[in-house]
């Protein structure tokens, strides 16, 4: 029995936990709404369930979702929650009017003046106190909006306070309008830096207010939305993103118009271009350094300045890429996607096929379309040429891109530095830091483009051996390549065995597919963790800090490491891992040999036992203790048979021996 103080402490902890967290069911009861409405409200307000640590999971339960009580209490007086309750009351009035046949009252209730509507203006101001915070969420917003912009609506409705399970006509029109405004801004401001064509669609990257924004535009084709998807969740995100992008685009367009007006005024007055369409100084990305600022702040400002200068160089190379060129896009090519790249790089898109006004024709056919004549002064290229020029920031030779020619590989600029410039290398390093599993392999096509940009360029690793080693054995996952041997499985090797393990055989060895078993203690720990649902529990804070410090130390050592030292380190790691693999193979072979010996010895011992049994039976037959039955197929114990006959003569029954219990070796609960 627990002490009074211990019981009181447990009670206080439990009450404190109840005050701090609420379950989803408690939150819906507090707000007096259904779970669907509660989930939609949380999406709009940016409230998500909290991950609890192990001690709190034990006293609360594993299958429940918990929210901070203070965040749920904020929703009690929220205007969106009040509008949802008002809409529920309005629905009851409409049903009553329909049931009673009051057409005039029904007409008044369904008018836009009476029907409740909610506004997300205050919510957007709460979630994004600074404009740069909203810019950082534009990538997810534009990917979602572009997805629904080409989907056909299924419900005719202009309001979003209802819970729709399919795309409405009002949201579809707003999504198309936002996409057009965003493409227009990117083309006017000329902030597009990269592009890539993939199976999923068209990837773009733009630098807006000092932030890299990447979004995905899907391929437009006949579609059918798959069943079984809760669309109201995605539509809730879409509703919020549409409202957010209105504010973002208004701010960007007004800043762009102001900068263009200032630039024109400066050109008219002084004849010198002072401002560009995109001014990073007005982006609010940098802070002014005071005179008494410490060294850490100075270092941060210096890093931000270098980042800003690299982005400025990147944009300067792209903005005048297609200057003076006019492209005609054939009808089989999606004109929106390629017109965005051409306009953002300073080129023009022709609407009519007039050879005197055109320099390039973009065709995605093995031959020219019917009715179009070929002219020698024009270049007829395939669509990939536009994106490859954008990524290389250079007008590439059209050889290999003409109609009917086999295209070169289309390399993603997000994982490989195509130009090998400082700004591209910095961007790729940041991507690798955010996504550690990206392999830094440089294809041969990238070396060709780098040679075109800089004739003095020479590839350090043209065959990609170092990149192959990095992809196969990374520093963070080197322990996964070879399973660690436990103490009970480890066996000391002699000198001859080590020499045999190091010797490279002339034949190809059979791969060891045997699974290495966990030790009993480790297996028991894993079992207990699974029972307590702690396999995916959050990492301890001390352990997380230690891992973060180790990771930072590894990154620092990598930055100061030369390419030769890196190659030597990778080769030594490979040799060490090969030795460990050979050691493991030898240990597995030893275990296989032990099992084979055990099997052979069992067969030999069984044969010996059988021979001894037969010899004993022959001896007993010779002594008369056993004799054959009448049919000659069995043996009978002479003494036992005599006792049975005497008992039968006295009309008694001989007590038979109990049969052996086959479950004798099993535990009692099985019997």
From Swiss-Prot:
Could you tell me the superkingdom of the organism this chain comes from?
Eukaryota
Chief subcellular location: nucleus
- Which Pfam families does the UniProt record give? BRCT_2, Pescadillo_N
Q: Which residues form the BRCT domain?
A: 317-403
Annotated localization: Nucleus, Nucleolus; Nucleus, Nucleoplasm
User: Which molecular-function annotations from GO does this UniProt entry contain?
Assistant: ribonucleoprotein complex binding; RNA binding
User: Keyword annotations for this protein?
Assistant: Coiled coil, Nucleus, Ribosome biogenesis, rRNA processing
The record's listing under SUPFAM superfamilies reads: BRCT domain
PROSITE patterns associated with the record: BRCT
- Which SMART domains does the UniProt entry name for this protein? BRCT
Per the record, the coiled-coil ranges are 548-584
Task: Report residue spans for region: Disordered.
Answer: 552-578, 643-671
**A single cellular component GO annotation:** nucleoplasm
One Gene Ontology term of the biological-process aspect is:
maturation of LSU-rRNA from tricistronic rRNA transcript (SSU-rRNA, 5.8S rRNA, LSU-rRNA)
What biological function has been recorded for the protein in this entry? Required for maturation of ribosomal RNAs and formation of the large ribosomal subunit.
Q: Which family does it belong to?
A: Belongs to the pescadillo family.
Kindly give the HAMAP family that the UniProt entry links to this protein: Pescadillo
Entry protein name: Pescadillo homolog
């Amino acid at each position: 029995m627990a002490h009074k103080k211990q019981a009181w402490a447990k009670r206080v902890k439990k009450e404190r936990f109840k005050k701090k967290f609420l379950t989803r069911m408690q939150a819906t009861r507090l707000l007096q709404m259904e779970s669907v409405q509660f989930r939609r409200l949380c999406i709009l307000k940016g409230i998500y369930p909290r991950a609890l640590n192990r001690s709190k999971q034990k006293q609360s339960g594993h299958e429940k979702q918990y929210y901070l009580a203070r965040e749920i209490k904020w929703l009690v007086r929220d205007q969106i929650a009040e509008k949802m309750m008002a809409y529920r009351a309005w629905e009851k009035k409409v049903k009553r009017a329909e049931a009673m046949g009051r057409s005039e009252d029904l007409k008044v209730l369904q008018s836009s003046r009476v029907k409740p509507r909610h506004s997300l203006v205050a919510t957007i101001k709460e979630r994004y106190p600074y404009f740069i915070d909203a810019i950082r969420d534009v990538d997810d917003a534009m990917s979602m909006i572009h997805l629904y912009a080409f989907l056909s609506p299924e419900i005719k409705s202009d309001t979003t306070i209802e819970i729709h399970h399919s795309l409405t006509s009002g949201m579809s029109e707003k999504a198309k309008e936002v996409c057009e405004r965003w493409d227009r801004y990117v083309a006017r401001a000329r902030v597009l830096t990269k592009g890539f064509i993939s199976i999923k669609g068209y990837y773009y990257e733009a630098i807006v207010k000092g932030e890299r924004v990447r979004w995905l535009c899907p391929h437009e084709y006949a579609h059918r939305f798959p069943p079984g998807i809760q669309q109201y969740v995605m539509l809730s995100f879409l509703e919020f993103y549409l409202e957010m992008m209105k504010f973002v685009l208004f701010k960007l367009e007004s800043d762009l118009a102001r900068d263009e007006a200032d630039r024109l005024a400066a050109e008219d007055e002084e004849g010198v271009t002072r401002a560009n369409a995109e001014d990073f100084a007005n982006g609010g990305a940098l802070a002014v350094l005071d005179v008494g600022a410490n060294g850490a702040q100075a270092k941060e400002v210096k890093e931000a300045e270098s980042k800003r200068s690299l982005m400025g160089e990147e944009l300067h190379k792209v903005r005048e890429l297609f200057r003076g060129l006019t492209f005609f896009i054939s009808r089989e090519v999606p004109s929106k996607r390629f017109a965005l790249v051409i306009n953002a790089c300073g080129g023009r898109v022709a609407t009519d096929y007039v050879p005197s006004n055109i320099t390039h024709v973009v065709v995605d056919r093995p031959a020219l379309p019917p009715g179009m004549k070929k002219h020698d002064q024009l270049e007829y290229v395939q669509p990939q040429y536009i994106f490859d020029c954008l990524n290389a920031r250079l007008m590439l030779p059209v050889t290999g891109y003409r109609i009917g020619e086999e295209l070169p590989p289309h390399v993603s600029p997000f994982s490989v530095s195509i130009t090998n410039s400082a700004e591209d290398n910095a961007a790729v390093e940041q991507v690798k830091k955010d996504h550690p599993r990206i392999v830094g392999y440089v294809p041969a096509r990238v070396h060709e483009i780098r040679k075109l940009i800089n004739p003095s360029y020479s590839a350090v690793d043209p065959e990609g051996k170092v990149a192959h080693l990095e992809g196969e054995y990374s520093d963070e996952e080197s322990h996964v390549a070879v399973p660690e041997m436990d103490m009970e499985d480890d066996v000391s090797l002699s000198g001859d065995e080590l020499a045999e393990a190091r010797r490279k055989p002339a034949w190809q060895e059979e791969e060891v597919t045997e699974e290495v078993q966990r030790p009993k203690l480790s297996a028991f720990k894993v079992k207990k963790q699974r029972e307590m649902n702690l396999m995916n529990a959050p990492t301890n804070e001390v352990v997380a800090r230690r891992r973060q410090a180790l990771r930072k130390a590894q990154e620092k050592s990598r930055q100061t490491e030369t390419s030769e030292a890196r190659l030597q380190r990778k080769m030594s790691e490979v040799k060490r891992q090969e030795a460990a693999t050979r050691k493991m193979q030898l240990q597995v072979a030893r275990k296989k040999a032990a099992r084979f010996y055990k099997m052979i010895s069992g067969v030999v011992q069984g044969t010996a036992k059988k021979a001894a049994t037969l010899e004993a039976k022959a001896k007993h037959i010779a002594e008369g203790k056993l004799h054959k039955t009448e049919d000659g197929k069995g043996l009978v114990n002479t003494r036992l048979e005599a006792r049975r006959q005497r008992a039968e003569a006295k009309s008694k029954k001989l007590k038979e021996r109990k049969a052996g219990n086959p479950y004798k070796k099993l535990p009692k609960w099985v019997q």
